[in-house]
Amino acid sequence: MNIYNVIMAGGGGTRFWPISRQKTPKQLLNLSGVDTLINETIDRVNKLSHKDNLFIVTNKSQRELMKETVDDKCHHNNILSEPIAKNTSAAIGFAAINIMKKYGDGIMCVYPADHYIKLEEEFLDSLEKAIE
């Protein structure tokens, strides 16, 4: 069974103001000193499956910026723009529909783009157990 990783990255950048804004939302900030939160999330979840199975859900206004930020870590045609920003469940449903149309059945793991995971190995072990 294929594993599809979905990263939700459509936040407007208002909750972390004044550091983040609409043009530089939190997921595009480098808070760890290593990389942006979105790129750290991509690096983490791509250990579970191939980058072909990685999808990012964002909003229309941030799609181009997201493509620049993630560069070659995610296929640009897998960066999905929500037609209308609604909420978390709508973003998950939007990703699920796109994945089902493209690939059919599989396991979809959903992650926020802006979380800091200190114990990465433990996190990945937990995900692998859940997938089994």
Where do the model's predicted regions map?
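Conserved donor NDP-sugar-binding/catalytic core segment of glycosyltransferases
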Residues: 131-132
